Design a protein with these regions (language model features):
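Short hydrophobic beta-strand element within catalytic cores of glycosyltransferases
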Residues: 250-253, 263
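Conserved donor-binding/catalytic core segment of Leloir-type glycosyltransferases
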Residues: 140-159, 164-168, 180-181
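Nucleotide-activated donor-binding/catalytic signature segment of Leloir-type glycosyltransferases, i.e.
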Residues: 193-214
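Donor nucleotide-sugar binding/catalytic pocket of nucleotide-sugar-dependent glycosyltransferases
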Residues: 6-7, 87-138, 148
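A short, well-ordered alpha-helix in the C-terminal region of glycosyltransferases
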Residues: 279, 286, 293-308, 314-320
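Short His-centered aromatic/hydrophobic patch
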Residues: 41-47, 65
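Glycosyltransferase donor-sugar binding loop
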Residues: 152, 179-194
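Conserved acidic donor-binding segment of nucleotide-sugar-dependent glycosyltransferases
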Residues: 265-266, 270-277, 286-291
Length: 328
C-alpha cells in the first residue's frame, strides 16, 4: 500500500513520564525528518505527542478520538491528576489554528469541547472507523435449540462481561436459557483485567462458552442470534456492534460511549441503563423470546450501517478533512 513505517516505542498502560518523554523526543525527531504535509494522530498518547509537535511548528494536524479511554472513566486521585494534565495539553494543542479534532460520536465531542474549550468549527464527528458491508454480509440468523448470545471483547471488567453473567444467572432462575459464547483477548497486565482462572471457572460452571482469542469474529456473529456488549468503558463506536449490525444481528448494549450512537433503542437493538444487570436481564429476555423482533432489528441494523457507518463514507469524509486542513 506504500506505507513507510517508523517505530516509536510506546507502552499503552504505562504512566512512566520518563518513558513517555523519551517516546515524545523520538517521535518529534522522526516528524522533523519527514516534514509531513499533515499529521493524523489516533488514540491518547500519539495525539498528545503529535498534537504538541504540530502546535510548536504550526503544522496541519488531525486529532482523532476513538473513545475517551479510562483516563476519563476512573476518579481515583492519580487518574484525576492525569486527566487534568491531559486537558491542559489538549488546550495547548487546540491553539493550533491548523488543527482539527475528530470524534466518533457527539457525546465525546461535547465533553471534550467543554473541557478543553475547542472552537466548535474545529470539531467534527465521523461515525466510527467504518466497515465494509460487502465483506460483512447480511445473513438470516440460524435457529438453534438453545439461542446463542455472543460477547467478544478484551477481557476487562469495564467491558461488561460480569453484568452479562449476572443477567444469565437471573434468567436461568426463570428457566430461560441461552449459550453465552465469549471470545476475547486476555489483558493480563491490566488492572481492570478479568483473571483467566475466573474465566475458566465460569466456563466450567456452564455460565459461558469460552472460545479464547478468535481470528474470525465474523463467523461467530453469523452463528449467533444476539450480540451483547454491556460496556461501561468510554468507547468510540465498538467494532463488534458495527460488524454485528452489518451482518443483521440484534444487539444489546449499555447507554455509554458510542454504543447508543449506533444502536437505536427498539430499532436495531436495545439500549440498557449502565450497570444494571437486572434491566439487562429483562431486555435480554425480551430478545430471546421474540425471534421475529430480532429479525426486524437485524434488518434495520444492516440499513443503518450502510447509510451512516460504511467504510467508504468514513474514508471520503476523512480525505475531505485532509484537504481542508492542509489548505487552511
Amino acid at each position: 500500500l506504500g506505507f513507510i513505517c517508523h517505530n516509536v516505542s510506546l507502552v499503552a498502560q504505562s504512566f512512566n513520564m520518563f518513558v513517555f518523554f523519551r517516546a515524545f523526543l523520538n517521535a518529534r525527531k522522526i516528524i522533523k525528518e519527514i516534514n509531513p504535509d499533515l499529521l493524523h494522530c489516533i488514540t491518547l498518547k500519539p495525539c498528545l505527542i503529535g498534537g504538541v509537535s504540530a502546535r510548536r511548528s504550526n503544522s496541519p494536524v488531525v486529532i482523532s478520538f476513538v473513545g475517551l479511554g479510562r483516563i476519563f472513566l476512573y476518579n481515583t486521585v492519580p487518574m484525576r491528576i492525569l486527566r487534568a494534565l491531559t486537558v491542559l495539553v489538549y488546550k495547548y494543542i487546540a491553539g493550533n489554528k491548523r488543527g482539527v479534532f475528530i470524534f466518533e460520536h457527539d457525546k465525546d465531542r461535547r465533553k471534550i469541547s467543554r473541557l478543553v474549550g475547542i472552537d466548535y468549527h474545529k470539531t467534527i464527528v465521523i461515525e466510527g472507523a467504518g466497515i465494509n458491508p460487502d465483506i460483512y454480509k447480511f445473513s438470516i440468523e440460524k435457529k438453534h435449540e438453545i439461542p446463542i448470545v455472543l460477547f467478544a471483547s478484551r477481557m476487562l471488567w469495564s467491558k461488561g462481561l460480569g453484568d452479562l453473567i449476572e443477567a444469565k444467572k437471573i434468567l436461568r432462575q426463570k428457566n430461560i436459557h441461552f449459550v453465552l459464547n465469549v471470545a476475547g483477548i486476555l489483558a493480563e497486565d491490566d488492572k481492570d483485567a478479568i483473571p483467566l482462572e475466573l474465566i475458566h471457572h465460569w466456563h466450567n460452571e456452564g455460565l459461558i462458552n469460552w472460545l479464547g482469542r478468535s481470528s474470525n469474529v465474523y463467523e461467530l456473529i453469523q452463528k449467533s442470534n444476539i450480540v451483547a456488549l454491556p460496556s461501561v468503558y468510554p468507547e468510540g463506536v465498538p467494532r463488534l456492534l458495527l460488524e454485528a449490525s452489518s451482518v443483521g444481528r440484534a444487539c444489546i448494549a449499555y447507554d455509554t460511549g458510542g454504543c447508543d450512537s449506533l444502536i437505536i433503542h427498539n430499532y436495531n437493538g436495545l439500549i440498557v441503563k449502565s450497570n444494571s444487570a437486572q434491566e439487562l436481564a429483562v431486555e435480554l429476555e425480551y430478545l430471546l423470546k421474540n425471534p421475529q423482533i430480532r429479525l426486524e432489528m437485524g434488518a434495520n441494523g444492516r440499513k443503518r450501517v450502510k447509510e451512516l457507518f460504511s467504510s467508504i463514507l468514513v474514508i471520503n469524509k476523512t480525505l475531505q478533512i485532509y484537504k481542508d486542513t492542509i489548505g487552511c
